[in-house]
């Protein structure tokens, strides 16, 4: 039965940036589909009760992904707790806003370190574990509309998210022979901490809502279906694709 292919029972998913917003929404969606969750966040993840309320197991790992130091430990702790990993959701990310003429090297490096460098090396560590298990696996990178467009005032964020889409394609090509699916989700304008400055600007917010065919801000729950699909056997023939969940923004 087709619905059985979406079932994640017995799977273990690592979700970075798991405590709030999009990461929390995807973690809960994966748990509802049957996966046990390893939540990774800069602060100790706070949503253990919500995951366990779905009848799933939860391991919280506190890790600062602005450096590569925690990465091997994340995989090791997950495997020690659950015996395996099957899914990686690379959701952790930061943003810095300023005009390109005034943008600092620190704001450039801070964003690229979290959004692209740590993402790549966490993909690498997870893929090595998938290969050693001999079972394949699923990697879901979180891209952005800025993977497709330029935007303004966020040069390092646009660069990082363009890189995420490119890396997703490259890794998919290299790792498909290992039965590893690497795909990405590009959220549209979502009601999260990252978009709070825009939502607080009535003029800018109104302009955005007039362009989005769905006529509203996206919510974390809007990514759950895409995340479950890309984490499940239903997407086994998908490699290197970036799926926009954007209320129709790119179609406009």
PLM-predicted stretches and their roles:
Residues 144:
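Residue(s) in the substrate-gating loop at a strand-loop-helix junction
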Residues 12, 19-21:
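Conserved glycine-rich cofactor-binding loop
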Residues 33-47:
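Conserved glycine-rich Rossmann-like NAD(P)H-binding loop of the short-chain dehydrogenase/reductase
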Residues 99-100, 104-112, 208:
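Substrate-binding pocket helix/loop in short-chain dehydrogenase/reductase
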């Amino acid at each position: 039965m087709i619905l059985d292919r979406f079932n994640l029972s017995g799977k273990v998913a690592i979700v970075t940036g798991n405590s709030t917003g999009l990461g929390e929404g995807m973690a809960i969606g994966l748990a509802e589909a049957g996966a046990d969750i390893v939540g990774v966040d800069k602060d100790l993840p706070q949503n253990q009760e919500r995951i366990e309320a779905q009848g799933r197991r939860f391991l919280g790992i506190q890790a600062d992904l602005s450096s590569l130091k925690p990465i091997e430990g994340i995989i090791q702790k997950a495997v020690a707790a659950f015996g395996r990993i099957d899914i990686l959701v690379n959701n952790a990310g930061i943003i810095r806003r300023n005009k390109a003429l005034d943008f600092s090297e620190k704001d450039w490096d801070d964003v690229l370190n979290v959004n692209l460098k740590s993402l790549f090396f966490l993909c690498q560590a997870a893929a090595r574990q998938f290969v050693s298990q001999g079972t394949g696996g699923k990697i879901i990178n979180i891209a952005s509309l800025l993977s497709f467009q330029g935007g303004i005032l966020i040069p390092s964020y646009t660069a990082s998210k363009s890189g995420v889409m490119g890396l997703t394609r490259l890794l998919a090509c290299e790792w498909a022979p290992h039965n590893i699916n690497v795909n990405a989700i590009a959220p549209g304008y979502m009601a999260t901490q990252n978009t709070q400055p825009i939502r607080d600007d009535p003029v800018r917010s109104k302009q955005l809502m007039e362009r989005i065919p769905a006529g509203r801000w996206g919510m974390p729950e809007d990514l759950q279906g895409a995340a479950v699909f890309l984490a499940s056997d239903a997407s086994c023939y998908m490699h290197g694709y970036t799926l926009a969940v954007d209320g129709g923004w790119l179609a406009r």
